[in-house]
C-alpha cells in the first residue's frame, strides 16, 4: 500500500470524525423540534462556527485523538524495547492523560504524561461535555476489559473513540482490540461490541484496495462481530444494524428513519444510526454528516462515528474543504494522522 494513500485514509477518518462531531455538538442536547426552530426546517446544515470563526469539537474527538496517541506512543515504546504490552494498556494510560485535561487527578500517574503532545495542547485542556461513565471509570483506578467488566454501561462513550484501532494491523484483531479499548470504561456488550465492529470496519476500509461497496464492508464486519461473540446482546445489536441497512434503501426521510433506530445514547444505536447515514449517502460526506446529526439524540457521537466510517473510505482529499477551514484544531488532527501514518508505515516496512 502506498504511504500517501494510507495517510489520506487515516487523516480522512480522523478529520471527518471531527467534522461530524463538531456539527452535532451544537445540538447534542436538543430535540428535533428545537433544532428546526433554531436552524430551519432541514435542521443544522452548516458548521456552527463561534466568534473566532471556528466550530468546536467535543469530548468525542478529544478521546479519539488520545486513543490515536496512545497507540502511536505504545508502538514506538514496544519497538524500542523489543517487547510490549497489549495495545489497550497503552490506550488506558492515554485516557488517563485525557482525564487530566478535564481538570481531574488520575488515580495513578499516566505512562505518557511526560511525552503526550495532546496533554500539552492548551485547547484540549477543556471540558466539552465529557461522559460521566468515562470519568467515573477512569477515576476508579481500575482498567476494565471484556472479560472483567468495570460496570454494566452500554453508553456510546465507548464506540465514539475507537476508530483508530483500525489503523494498525500489528496489534492483532481490530475487532477484538476495538472492543477492549471501549471496555476500559464501558462493560456491557452493547457498549464494546459496536466499538469492535467500528474498528474492524475502519481497518477494512483503510486497507481495502478493491473499492468494495460500503454495504458489503458493513455486512462482512457485522458477520465477523457475531461470529466472535455469540451473545444475545450482540445478536440484538446485529439486528439493529441490519435494520439500519434496510432503512437506508427506503424513501423514508432521514430523521424518521433515525428516530426509528433510537437516540444514539447507547453504543448499538449510535453505530446503527451512523451506518444508516453512511449507506444512505455513501459518496457525499456533507449529506451523510447532516443526516447523522439531525435528530433528537446524541448528535455529536452519531456524527463523529459516521465521519470516521466515510472518512476512512473516501479519504481526506474527498472531505469538504470549506468545513475543514471552519474547524478548530485541524493542525493537531493532521499531526496525529501523520504520527500514526509514520508508525503504521514502519510496522509495514513501507518506504
Where are the predicted features?
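Structured, active/binding-site neighborhoods that engage oxygen-rich ligands
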Residues: 1-351
Amino acid at each position: 500500500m502506498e504511504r500517501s494513500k494510507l495517510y489520506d485514509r487515516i487523516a480522512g477518518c480522523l478529520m471527518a470524525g471531527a467534522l461530524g462531531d463538531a456539527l452535532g455538538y451544537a445540538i447534542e442536547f436538543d430535540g428535533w423540534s428545537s433544532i428546526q426552530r433554531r436552524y430551519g426546517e432541514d435542521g443544522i446544515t452548516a458548521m456552527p462556527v463561534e466568534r473566532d470563526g471556528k466550530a468546536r469539537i467535543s469530548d468525542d474527538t478529544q478521546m479519539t485523538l488520545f486513543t490515536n496517541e496512545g497507540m502511536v506512543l505504545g508502538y514506538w515504546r514496544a519497538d524500542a524495547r523489543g517487547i510490549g504490552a497489549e495495545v489497550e494498556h497503552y490506550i488506558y494510560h492515554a485516557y488517563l492523560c485525557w482525564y487530566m485535561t478535564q481538570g481531574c487527578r488520575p488515580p495513578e500517574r499516566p505512562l505518557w504524561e511526560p511525552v503526550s503532545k495532546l496533554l500539552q495542547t492548551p485547547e484540549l485542556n477543556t471540558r466539552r461535555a465529557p461522559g460521566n461513565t468515562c470519568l467515573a471509570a477512569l477515576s476508579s483506578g481500575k482498567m476494565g476489559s471484556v472479560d472483567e467488566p468495570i460496570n454494566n454501561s452500554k453508553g456510546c462513550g465507548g464506540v465514539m473513540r475507537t476508530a483508530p484501532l483500525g489503523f494498525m494491523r500489528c496489534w492483532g484483531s481490530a475487532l477484538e482490540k476495538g472492543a477492549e479499548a471501549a471496555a476500559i470504561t464501558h462493560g456491557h456488550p452493547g457498549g464494546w461490541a459496536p466499538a469492535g465492529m467500528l474498528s474492524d470496519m475502519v481497518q477494512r476500509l483503510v486497507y481495502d484496495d478493491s473499492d468494495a461497496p460500503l454495504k458489503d464492508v458493513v455486512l462482512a464486519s457485522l458477520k465477523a462481530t457475531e461470529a466472535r461473540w455469540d451473545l444475545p446482546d450482540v445478536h440484538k445489536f446485529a439486528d439493529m444494524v441490519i435494520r439500519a441497512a434496510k432503512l437506508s434503501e427506503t424513501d423514508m426521510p432521514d430523521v424518521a428513519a433515525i428516530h426509528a433506530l433510537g437516540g444514539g445514547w447507547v453504543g448499538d444505536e449510535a453505530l446503527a444510526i451512523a451506518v444508516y447515514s453512511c449507506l444512505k449517502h455513501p459518496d457525499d460526506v456533507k449529506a451523510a454528516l447532516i443526516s447523522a446529526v439531525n435528530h433528537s439524540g446524541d448528535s455529536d457521537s452519531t456524527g463523529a462515528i459516521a465521519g470516521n466510517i466515510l472518512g476512512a473510505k473516501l479519504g481526506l482529499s474527498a472531505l469538504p474543504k470549506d468545513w475543514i477551514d471552519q474547524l478548530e484544531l485541524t493542525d493537531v488532527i493532521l499531526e496525529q494522522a501523520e504520527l500514526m501514518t509514520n508508525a503504521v508505515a514502519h510496522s509495514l516496512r513501507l518506504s
